[in-house]
Amino acid sequence: MKTKIAKHLLQIKAVSLKPDEPFTWASGIKSPIYCDNRLTLSYPEVRHDIAEGLKELILTHFEGAEVIAGTATAGIPHAALAADRLNAPMCYVRSKPKAHGKGNQIEGAVSKGQKVVVVEDLISTGGSVLEVVAALQEAGCDVLGVAAIFTYGLPKATAAFQEKNIPYVTLTDYDTLTDVALELKAIEPSAMNKLKRWRQDPSSESWMEETV
């Protein structure tokens, strides 16, 4: 599954790799990779495989899940598709409460004590999805963990999830994707060193330097 989803993401250009012309993230980080999983919704086969994959992840790793929660906004459609396949209730969670109306942060019916799995499209540092987890926990839910399409596998994310004692699983990951990209000739072999060095310390720009 990891290889299949990685190929999908590369072939539809949901993931772009440019180690020699790095992207600038909103945080200011210079990155050789950019991921836009919203594109997956436009491709029925890809969308189907992601939904089936998320269903299997949830059944395998989060036994007893009662509610599927999507992160606003990118996680919502994938949560809905997975919940439909699981015949489970679904809700979604904003990063912060609405400033008007009822001021809801959680939209949908969810009750105290219910076992919830959060669906996210992408895990970078883990900060935003863990805010969603915290909101659900504050509402009295038992959050079993997070299921996502892709993770960069950053050390910061691993540490953040461990600190909160929240497990997470993904359909594919950075190592798989870069290996598949090399196989598909989407990157040159010489680029692999830069890609590995960036992942070790994304906040440093030393990965962009040429090494002998």
Swiss-Prot record:
Its cofactor is Mg(2+). Keywords: Glycosyltransferase, Magnesium, Pyrimidine biosynthesis, Transferase. Orotate binds at residue 124. GO terms for biological process: 'de novo' UMP biosynthetic process; pyrimidine nucleobase biosynthetic process. GO terms for molecular function: magnesium ion binding; orotate phosphoribosyltransferase activity. It is an enzyme of class 2 (transferase). This is Orotate phosphoribosyltransferase. It comes from Bacillus pumilus (strain SAFR-032). The lineage of its organism: Bacteria, Bacillati, Bacillota, Bacilli, Bacillales. The gene is pyrE.
